[in-house]
Structure formats: structure tokens, C-alpha cells
Amino acid sequence: MAAAAAGPASSQRLFQSFSDALIDGDPQAALEELTKALEQNPDDAQYYCQRAYCHILLGKYRDGIADVKKSLELNPNNCTALLRKGICEYHEKDYASALETFAEGQKLDSTDTNFDTWIKRCQEIQNGSESEVSASQRTQSKIKYDWYQTESHVIITLMIKSVQKNDVRVGFSERELSALVKIPAGEDYSLKLRLLHPIIPEQSTFKVLSTKIEIKMKKPEAVRWEKLEGQGDEPTPKQFTADVKNMYPSSSHYTRNWDKLVGEIKEEEKNEKLEGDAALNKLFQQIYSDGSDEVKRAMNKSFMESGGTVLSTNWSDVGKRKVEINPPDDMEWKQY
């Protein structure tokens, strides 16, 4: 009987040795002693709760959560265990779970002001996070990007000005593009795309310019991309053809073939009917453009030596002599 009576007294002394004050003094030593105690008494809810406190002081919040969960399984109405569970969840940045845990503990003990304090902390952080998300969403909506393709590349342009190269991170994988940009205003812009077709990551690059960020993704094959993004099985891609070269889909509802536009402009210039000096100048330009090296040398030499009064294409003539100044009959040449 004497031995039986000594058991509870010994257990009480052991429990007293694990008070919060003693744990504060040396949490690591207390952790080791509590682990030994739990080996002897694996169903002691209070030991788990106190060991969780050791984990909190040592910054091991996940281990703390595991211990308080075990403590609450053995004693669901342990307010201290709920408080410590919420603290661990808070430090693990699981603010929603922490808020729920603190609210549960407050229902059990409304006089403990610790629950009020931690509930307010969670609410402040959650409200702050919502504000940050709203600011980020505003940034995302302001910044636009365009894309176009050539036979060998798909090019994305981010319309972001005055960004330093060190503030830009771009990642390439076979079917994914990610970009993170630190905006001068202090907000971040992120872009993540699941690409329609594969790219060659190691041959893909980006360039930071004063007015934009240009991302060039290398195509493994000269195929035409019908769109930028896509998932799953895609139809057999079409081979890239000249009639779609350098089309800029952009954010507009139409595409423009810039090569075709340049060709049309050149054709208009070629067929433009000029009169007077303009027609004569165009004729000289055409002669010079189509001429041989000797013709070009003759035109340059005659024009320079004559002060612009003679233009000859006969190199065998002007190459042997200095071309004299010869103004038109009704004009007089003067040197200024």
C-alpha cells in the first residue's frame, strides 16, 4: 500500500517540475524530461500540452501543433492547449486556422484575455493581406502584354517602363513561362502562362528596355501558334507560312501583317507619279541604285568636283580628268 501511495505523490512532483516558469528557464532540458515522462505516461494530456510549450519557445511550431492535438484528443476542454495550438498555427502563417482555434478557446474561457489579443492579431493580418491582394490585383490589371511570332520565336512584350534588370526574374520550362517584376512603385507584377506548344528553354531569353520587357521564346519547330496558351492535347500544329509571318495578335481583336504593310508602302512609292525636280531626283536615285561600281564612282566624282553642276555615269571619261564646274546656261555658279 505504501508503494501505491507513493505513485501519485511522485507524479505530482513530476508535474510541478514542468511548470511554465521552469520551462522558460531551459526549454530544451524540459523538452527532454517531458519526452521521458511521456514514455512512462503516454496518455497524459498535460505533458503533451507542456511539451508543446517547449516547442513554441524553441520555434518548432509544427511539432508543437502535433503535441497539442494529442493533448486535445485526451482532453478536448483544455483551454491552454487551444491557446498554444492557435499560437503555433499563427507562427506557421495559417491565420484562418489560428483564428478558428482562438475563437474556440474563447468560448471555453471568456475571461482569458490572451484569446482576445491573439484574435485581434489574426484579424489585423488577414485584413492587411486582403489589402495587399487588392493592390496586387490593381497592378495586374494596369499592366498589359502583347505577343507575336516569327518563324523561329514567340515574343512577349510586357508594357512596363523604367525597370532595372535586377528587378526582373523570368523562368522558362518546356511548356511554361513565368515572370516576376518588381515595379518601381513597390508592387510586384507576376505572369504565369501554360504555353500552347513546347519551347526550348535554354535558347529562350529576355531583355529589359527602358519602355518594356521583351521575352523571346525559341520554337523547336517552325510551326504556327494559333494562340499563346493552351492545355492538354492540341490539334496538329500548322507549319509556319509566309502569309502569317510577323503577325502581331496583341490585345486587339485583329492581327496585322507588318511585312505585307511594308511591301505595300514600297509598291506605292515605286508607282508614285512625280513631276519636275522630284521626278528627276528619283531618276538619278534609280540610276545610282541600279548602277555598277564604276557608274557610282563616276556619279560621285562628277557631282563633287563640279559643285553639283555635272552628273556623269561615264567613268572612262570622268575618271581621267577633273570635272569642271558647268552651271546651266541661264544660271551663274557662285562659291559661298
From Swiss-Prot:
Query: How this protein is processed and modified after translation, per its record?
Result: Phosphorylated at Ser-252 and Ser-302, dephosphorylation promotes nuclear translocation, most likely due to disruption of the SUGT1-HSP90 complex.
State the name under which the record lists this protein: Protein SGT1 homolog
Where in the sequence is Phosphoserine found?
S252, S302
- In this UniProt entry, the residues modified to Phosphothreonine are T236, T255
- Gene symbol of the encoding locus: Sugt1
From the Swiss-Prot or TrEMBL record, state where the protein is found.
Cytoplasm; Nucleus
An example Gene Ontology cellular component term from the record?
Answer: nuclear body
The SGS domain covers 247-336
Supply the Gene3D superfamilies for this chain: 2.60.40.790, Tetratricopeptide repeat domain (1.25.40.10)
